Amino acid sequence: MYRALWLSPLRFIVSSSSSKLTPYVSRGRGLSGIDNGAGCSCSRSVTTMIGNEFIRCQDESKILQLQIVDALRSGERQGASALLFKLIQGNYSLSADDFHDILYYCARSPDPVFVMETYSVMCKKEISLDSRSLLFIVKSLCNGGHLDKASEFIHAVREDDRISPLLPIYNFFLGACARTRSVYHASKCLELMDQRRVGKNGITYVALLKLAVFQRNLSTVNDIWKHYVNHYNLDILSLRRFIWSFTRLGDLKSAYELLQHMVYLALRGEFFVKSNRGKLHSTRLYIPVPSKDETGSEKFAFGVTDRIVDCNSSSKVALPKGHNKILAIRVLRWSFNDVIHACGQSKNSELAEQLMLQLKVMQQQNLKPYDSTLATVAAYCSKALQVDLAEHLLDQISECSYSYPFNNLLAAYDSLDQPERAVRVLARMKELKLRPDMRTYELLFSLFGNVNAPYEEGNMLSQVDCCKRINAIEMDMMRNGFQHSPISRLNVLRALGAEGMVNEMIRHLQKAENLSAHSNMYLGTPTYNIVLHSLLEANETDMVINIFKRMKSCGCPADVATYNIMIDCCSLIHSYKSACALVSMMIRDGFSPKAVTFTALMKILLNDANFEEALNLLDQAALEEIHLDVLSYNTILRKAFEKGMIDVIEYIVEQMHREKVNPDPTTCHYVFSCYVEKGYHATAIEALNVLSLRMLNEEDKESLQDKKIELEENFVMSEDPEAETKIIELFRKSEEHLAAALLNLRWCAMLGGRIIWSEDQSPWARALSNKYG
């Protein structure tokens, strides 16, 4: 018995425009004629199978049905058609029951072609369809992808027929619409269900939820949830479906609330049975009766479960044979997996902490999630740099056969430069007897290869320690049967170069080159770039040139980074001609000069005090629409400061302002110091004031006037001895430019300068604009 529980249209799932289209249904002589595609438009009546006794098929018709099914299974379609013709030519009366086996097979196969052939034969013999026949036909057409034809069958049954299709037919059709994401057909079916007052049950809502998730329509899911709790008992299976929907649509708060309620039901010991086809069903007797005293949403909000019956009560139904009893813990784990996966993807750290508390509650009740779930979520947390949460999750794992979650955590520690915490990860892997893979060793070389860098330069002690670490990792790697990969080799070379171990780095490079020669492969360009850069940092210009020649001779192509390194090398040997030749090679290889290229060329010219050509390069970059950064301008400012060339300083400052390049503290230092050394102290203070304001981003500049009084009282003009400490705190909040600007303004005030909060108030800024603008 199905009650019409929700008669208001559910057409919020689709646009209202889709309801204007209807599939074509032809009407014949009978009560419900359907165009079967073969010119068969016949009369028939649909009879119910509920409350009626079935007449047994004659033995001969039963045998013919089985023979037809066997022929279809073996692919003998012509033989099956011949047997079907023989079936209808018998001297006995036939009913829809004599075709059930055939139609059932066509529904399971699916075989929509033969099901229509069978239906055509039934039309010719004027055999009335019953509800089972109609269900099998609709299933066959839906499973075969013919939703249009299945929709015609459902719509063709008129109100004056002896019965309408039962709710399972509508539910199956809606499920097929959800699987194929056919919103139009689902809309037409829902309209028909409302017109015929068929009602809905839990299976209907499952299909509607899938359609709503497909459309990314969270409001629809909320509406379905409200209607569901008003008319149905909440059990673990229904909660799982809604949790799945909310997590897919990103409503983690609602999903978490339902998960808590689900844990409550699981702790009460609700059981399920699993059918032979893998379907889960509750063991409780289920009769949907709407509550009259309060809405289901209100009951859920207060945590009242007045209609939930204990598993040990008399309402439990007997379990049929052939079913396996399954604890609700499995369903709970699935839902917990959904929520925690979504939490990891959304990087919601607050909810993640709540989930960890929920996890502890579940563990106390032996409801621990799957190890695979914990591992996957730990990997997500590591990518989001939530290393504390990731490490906590990995500590909960009792068994793991793959190393990727641990590798992700090692990579996070590498990004955060926290190698000391990586030691605990390795210890945990050893506890789990988890064998490292190549990615693990690549990360170990990156984490533990260098000792002092980037904080200090390498010394003899750190270099010895670096060699010991690298050798230990290599020995363990070989014990586990791994050879160096391109990434691990690159990390080793980078570590040796950072420690200044040039000879050891060259030895590793030669070893890698020999191995590559035996395998008829060349080392990758990034590997050579690491070596070239490290040699350049060590001022080993001759070795840089030799490595570059070896690289070209072995056929390894150079990239933009390679050419820029070599142009930088030319600045050390003071050869502008060689740098120009490299630029020519770079262009021939298809690479366009970038900002770093122009900076390197200007550095060579400035080393020879050729400011005019350096400024010409600056203008050329502007003509070619190459946006130079603050490092490029600081390169010129540094040389101008060393030479005491105020005119060049002022020109570069105005050029930066015109190109909208914000200065940094280094820029302020060069400009301020140059004016001070020339004795222009008042101008130096004013310039420092203006450049400090220009360091701020647009958002800070817009709010500067509103916060001017507060900043003056608390930071700039404050006599509090802790004022500078408070300013430094801004660095920890990643507001380094604001902190540097406030420190500069405070020093300007201490030097007796008048603080201005707008560039327009500065005579110095206006003078530069008039002179060079």
From Swiss-Prot:
| Organism this protein belongs to | Arabidopsis thaliana (Mouse-ear cress)
Determine the domain of life of the protein's source.
Eukaryota
NCBIfam families attached here? PPR (TIGR00756)
PPR repeat ranges per the UniProt record: 130-165, 166-200, 201-231, 235-269, 332-369, 370-400, 402-436, 524-558, 559-593, 594-628, 629-663
Q: Which UniProt keywords apply?
A: Repeat
Q: What is this protein called?
A: Pentatricopeptide repeat-containing protein At1g76280
Instruction: Report the family membership.
Output: Belongs to the PPR family. P subfamily.
Asked if the keyword Repeat belongs to this entry, the reply reads: yes
